[in-house]
Amino acid sequence: LLGGGGLLQVATSALCLTYYLSVLRLARLFRKRVVVFNQSLGPLSPWGERRVRKALQGVPVILRDQDSLEYARRLGIPAALGADPALLLPPPPVPREEDLVLVIPRAGVQEEALTTLYVAANRLVHEGKQVLVLLLQPGYDDEVAEVFRLHRIERTSDPRRLLYLAAQAGYVISMRLHGLILAAAAGTPFAALSYDPKVAAFAKETGAYYQ
């Protein structure tokens, strides 16, 4: 089972794609059943497209967004449309604080995107909102903490804590896909700053604002 994530892409590295396709190939060599479940697809180089097309021949493929499904069809890969299983998580029974805005940045993005998010956070504070900056990858996101040092910051890699805060907040602004997914699971309005096609694809699927 190759499940839940954006593994079939070269944005991280071609080596990453090679690794996951090798896992699929080994599984088939040992006559194991293989399923691609709720993945996104792309971006891929022409080389990556050829490798993925070959690796997925005869494999059941379920993709988690419409853009990935259309991409698969252009590549001649039969696939069905699913959704991220995290959307099925029940939100905790926590009172909603309408003035609380959860801001979820990400390290490793263009400085312009972080600046946009920082300016938005400052403006929300000026308008009387409570802004909580949530860092979901402690260590990796430390450079982001410096950018938002004047704001309240919490670090966690626990999805249960993220879901709790998303359910508590009145609004979520996220650069990270799972910040958006758990906001949707909690029924909290959200907006996306897209660093990756999968983020824009999810926002588009749900009718949320994104840029």
Question: Whereabouts are the PLM-identified features?
Answer:
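Active-site anion-handling motifs in enzyme catalytic cores
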Residues: 1-211
